[in-house]
Amino acid sequence: MGSLTNNSTKIEGSGAPEDEISRSASDDAPNSDEHDERKRVEGASIALPAHVAGSGTLDRLVDTARGYAEASTAENTNKAYAADWKHFTRWCRQKGTDPLPPSPEMVGLYVADLAAATGKTPVLSVSTIERRLSGLAWNYTQRGFTLDRKDRHIATVLAGIKRKHARPPVQKEAILPEDIQAMVATLPHDLRGLRDRAILLVGFAGGMRRSEIVSLDVHKDDTPDSGGWIEFFEGGALLTLNAKTGWREVEIGRGSSDQTCPVHALEQWLHFSRIDFGPVFVRCSRDAKRALESRLSDKHVARLIKATVLKSNVRSDLPEAKRLAMFSGHSLRAGLASSAEVDERYVQKQLGHASAEMTRRYQRRRDRFRVNLTKAAGL
């Protein structure tokens, strides 16, 4: 592997295993039982009518329809729904009841159990409980049933939980420009360091979700699981993303310094990793001298952020445990919205927010106490 001429940065093997941040490949793989259960449910929900005789053509169409049905929700959503159903069915077995057909009375008791502190079981937040309910409703629909969330046995219990346990939403700490500069400075000058530098800088400048970062391909339609692709221009890079709110374009301009320019970091990573097709961000060999074929998991982004936050002493005034809890993959996205001193319309477009109110939520944190109405009123 050659050496970089720009910035006198040398590519060298660190010998550090990929496990330091991203763990083993098995950690990134979905639980096989949950995956099999999801496939079974989706397969059962798409089938020929009982009165129609099967044929080769129709059977192939059924398989095609099942594939589209599986792709109707994001992979992370599918995993969450499968885990929700697994947890609920285990709870039903423990209580001596059957999850099918849906019983609003039992679902109401389940929701109450989730909100109550019993033994070592942690109390779930209201948002997590609501997400569990969505998962149950989806699973019942796939099995040909309907869960009426407005039934009084569910709705009144949930309303009481909200009234008694609701708390303001906990937002992850935003990573600011000076933070990201300190974080990338902690990375080694080997192939893995080039990759992680590009991940942090591109994620910050693009205001991207961690799943969007790792789903990027070099070109359009390189892989079936692609979430977007990259085009390079003189002025920067254009990312086309299949995001949570639909397709959107993200413009990442070139920075004022190669040390912190996201486009330069991305170009360096692709050049020295010799990646010209398929996933942009992949695993590295243990000696950090070769780029492998397998796409990184979005978990790597969260681990990378936490690791570099600690190494760079970001918010070093706080205990380590609190710093780890404060920062996550979302901190990159929040950082751009909180830092950019531009019209909110441009920030909203970059982040792909469906409403300006979501963008303003970040900017209100940025602008907190900027205008002192107390002093302005003469007090």
What are these regions, as identified by a protein language model?
Residues D63-N76, K86-V170, A185-H189:
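N-terminal core-binding DNA-recognition domain of tyrosine recombinases/integrases
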Residues I180-R210, V214, P262:
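Basic, Lys/Arg- and aromatic-enriched nucleic-acid-binding interface segment
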Residues L351-G378:
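Catalytic-site neighborhood detector that most strongly recognizes the C-terminal catalytic loop/helix
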Residues M1-L100, L109:
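Basic/aromatic DNA-contact patch characteristic of tyrosine site-specific recombinases
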Residues G2, L201, S331-A354:
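C-terminal catalytic core of tyrosine-transesterase DNA break-rejoin enzymes
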Residues R195-R197, D298, A302, H330-A334:
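Short, leucine-enriched amphipathic alpha-helices that occur as contiguous helical runs
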